[in-house]
Amino acid sequence: MMSWKFGKKFKEGGFLSGKHHSSNNNSPSDTSRSTTPTPGNPHPEDAVKPPVPRSGMLKIRVTAAKGLSLPQGVSVPAPVQEALTTHPTLASRIATSPPTAIVKAAGANRDSLQRRQVWWLPYLVLEFDKNEVLVDALGGDLASPVWMYSATFDVSRISEISATVYLRTREPHAEGREKSNGEGEGEDMGNSDLCLGSIRFTPNLDSLRVTDDWVTVQGGGGSGSINVQVSFKPASGQILTIDSFELLKVIGKGSFGKVMQVRKRDTLRIYALKTIRKAHIVSRSEVTHTLAERTVLAQVNCPFIVPLKFSFQSKEKLYLVLAFINGGELFHHLQREGKFNETRSRFYSAQLLLALEHLHSFNVIYRDLKPENILLDYAGNIALCDFGLCKLNMSNSDTTNTFCGTPEYLAPELLSGHGYTKCVDWWTLGVLLYEMLTGLPPFYDENTNEMYRKILTEPLRFPDGVRSEARSLLTGLLNRDPRQRLGVNGAQDIKNHPFFAKHINFTKLWNKQIQPPFKPAVASAIDTSNFDEEFTNEVPLDSVVDDSHLSQTVQQQFEGFSWSVSPLGESVGRY
């Protein structure tokens, strides 16, 4: 299967070019930058409960806030204070003009330009089930910004609504180049922006009434409330097809198909659409892996895993509709920077630990952890993708012998053919952490056979910059005996290691209450600047497939693949 970018191995690129990583030695604060909601129940211990299927459209309108304040001990940034002094009446004048918050065709650019005139007022990141919208203020003041913004989200399961308020510390560099949906390009979110607090709640999808509440802000400055109006419209049994989407950009390609950025025509939400040609996966005996990916994605209920929104099919193709995570692959950032500092490496590996723990709770082994399969969201949190190599129905005592994965990350028990368990994922977590800290996997060699020999026999060595706690953790994760490997008794043993225990509150991390140490440069929900131009410059087309004459028996293998927006959460089709 494929992630969102294919074919380029980092060992052939920037890691060997001598580029240095940018230092960032600040520990993450306990102030949430992310607004990604935890679907369903936000508590890790209850995460084995699959998401409750629901379908329809959720309209969220955020009007304004009141009583917001800066975090204790933080003063108004100088550029913001200067803007307030220079333009004392602009914000209030714009706020009193007729709101154009519901962005539609003719008024889209005017709405966006109005918002950009008052960049110094708090902006909002609104999110539902990993679909994110950045909303600049129309007017008001620092304590009481006015947004008057509405957005419609697709509902495929019960999830939380979250909204986080930030204050820029400087004016965005780029002039807003307007998009057709009213979202401008520019440096909208800065890594130094101040979090003023957030709200999180689960909407009542059993009621058809509009709720209108002032929700108390948590974190940040610790004061104030935000007015949110919510209404839900159940689905009417519509069947999804490729015509339900506007194709925007190609963001990845593979032998089985491609991944495109798309906009759903009715709600205008942005998604990643993965297309898979049936004939290719049938000819390569990959049907089981493909169906496993769909099964896992429909089950997961974790804030660090890309959720499946819908799936549907035609006679020739399968389609997976996923949340579009546009901060780029970890591969992209690691290749550019060479390596990460310990704080950043710890943050990513801790979130991955929670994602793998969640998969293991469903008796699923991931088996393909690597930087290419890890995405960064708007705010800098990770999102694990590409579940084509997952192995299902693996209890703690079960073993499997399938030889699969990426050479640099293969565990010794897999290479030796003795069978392996869930512990194989802890080995790959160790390899990834080592690579983030040093720039290369621990046993890397350009000759694959020599690399396999090193994985099986070479002593584990560390560069001088790797500190003692990290060395201890890596030694435990990279134990060649899976029966002695750290994590053999469960993820909690890894969480308890000083490398994590001294620095990470895993409950806060699960609830997105720890600010990521890095935020990718993302201008808007449709920004694809973090993806390879080799793909994004290609014209997005759902290419015609020659009639493959798949028999009815073969087509029956794909029954149950479709998962869409009918009242029962299923879009059923036979071909």
From Swiss-Prot:
> Superkingdom, according to UniProt?
Eukaryota
Entry keyword set: ATP-binding, Kinase, Nucleotide-binding, Phosphoprotein, Serine/threonine-protein kinase, Transferase
- Ranges annotated as biased composition (Low complexity): 23-38
Under CDD domains, the record lists: STKc_YPK1_like, YPK1_N_like
Name the cystine pairs: none
Domain AGC-kinase C-terminal residue range list: 502-573
Q: Where does the record place the region Disordered?
A: 1-53
- Which parts pass through the membrane? none
InterPro entries tied to this protein: AGC-kinase_C, Kinase-like_dom_sf, Pkinase_C, Prot_kinase_dom, Protein_kinase_ATP_BS, Ser/Thr_kinase_AS
Set out the biological process GO terms recorded for this chain's protein: regulation of sphingolipid biosynthetic process
Which residue ranges does the record assign to the Protein kinase domain?
245-500
What is catalysed by this protein? L-seryl-[protein] + ATP = O-phospho-L-seryl-[protein] + ADP + H(+); L-threonyl-[protein] + ATP = O-phospho-L-threonyl-[protein] + ADP + H(+)
**Where do the catalytic residues lie?**
D368 (proton acceptor)
Q: What happens when the gene is disrupted?
A: Decreases virulence in a mouse systemic infection model. Sensitive to: high temperature; sirolimus; fluconazole; myriocin (phytosphingosine biosynthesis inhibitor); aureobasidin A (inositol-containing sphingolipid biosynthesis inhibitor); phytosphingosine. Abnormal sphingolipid metabolism.
Q: What is its EC number?
A: 2.7.11.1
| Effect of mutating D386A | Sensitive to fluconazole (cell wall stress inducer)
Which family would the database say this protein is a member of? Answer: Belongs to the protein kinase superfamily. AGC Ser/Thr protein kinase family. RAC subfamily.
According to its UniProt entry, what is the function of this protein? Probable serine/threonine-protein kinase which may act in the sphingolipid-mediated signaling pathway. May act downstream of TORC2 (TOR complex 2) and PDK1 to regulate sphingolipid metabolism.
Protein name per UniProt: Serine/threonine-protein kinase YPK1
Per the UniProt entry, what species is this protein from, by scientific name? Answer: Cryptococcus neoformans var. grubii serotype A (strain H99 / ATCC 208821 / CBS 10515 / FGSC 9487) (Filobasidiella neoformans var. grubii)
Top-level taxonomy: Eukaryota, Fungi, Dikarya, Basidiomycota, Agaricomycotina
